[in-house]
Amino acid sequence: RDLRMSRGLGDVYKRQTYADRYTGLAKLVQSDDSPDCFPFEICNYPYSVYQNLFQSLDGVIDFTTDDWADYKEAIDKFNWGGKNYCPIMSLTPTSYLWYRKSVVEEAGLDDPWELYEKGEWTWSTFMEMARKFSDPENGKYVLDGYNPENNFVCTTGTPLVSLEGGKLVSHMNDANIEKCLDMLRSFDNTQEQLRYPRDTENSWTPSYNEWADGNTLFFEDGSWRYEETWRKFKKKNKWEDDEVNFVPFPQMDGADKYYQSMKQDSIMLVAGAKNIDGYKAWIYSNLVASNDPEIAKVGREQSKEEYDWSDTLLDRIEMMNDPKTFSGVFDFKNGIGQDIASTENQDNPVEQLTKGPYMTGESYTSFRAQYQGQIDARLAELNKTVE
């Protein structure tokens, strides 16, 4: 509260349910009662700008200064129509592959983190490990989570939809994306049965218990999964500090760089916002805080004391979050309209491109043939608005 007041932001905030957040924001904008800030979400960008919910930061923030040097390359990838809207203040991998050390050892597998450190954590080593561990007749599966397929696609270095020169560009015909989704197709229970069958066994929900019981080798999720779930299993089962581990998604064989899907910490300036100076001050306060070593030190100690993080895992996270560790990939495929690209379900054209092969075993090319025309038409429609 005090920081908001000192920065001129006042002490008023609007509470909205998650499901109604954009509907509620639109009503506030239309009634000339816009809030100043709104959290950025790539799943609705740049469509949210097309809907006139946000305003450009050109003339508000100068992204050419040294303040933004670490994130300038990423910020440029979010340019829409020649304008900047996203003040990225930090980046972190969208998801990790979580695993248990003892499960890997008992299966006679190499430790994934050690493979990563040696530069040997690739698609091919991942698949070798997957096929060795998999034993569906005895309930042993390799991978679980809500969105592993999207993270894998980004390791090609090419998103399905990018922003280039301020416009949306389709890469649905990219050979490496096709290769990636052909690999993921093998995970379905109609193929090699490598993924946990959450659709038939758990009402489409990933199973934390199966991972904790050692029946699922990898679980795709963000760092918050440790705080919300894994640390509780650790305490209950009296695991050692080095039992819970994570590794980034494997590098594509032969890739020129190590690409990874990256999540952005960014706050948008709402259309019609009255307190531009307050917004700007808030952004710079967040930027300074996110890169302040003393604040990071306090946060680290809090993570250890309150959430049982180990120094080993925290060191790993710090390395993962360093802008120099990975080449960040940002996929704007879901930001072209909820009617054809909602992340809330997989039964829409955009989600079918990736979840279709992974969850049904049907080929990526069959889904592409079915939906490419509709998606390309939407991209052209949106691009026309910024010509």
Residue ranges and their predicted role:
Residues 22-34, 46, 51, 104, ...:
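Short helices/loops that flank or line small-molecule/ion binding pockets
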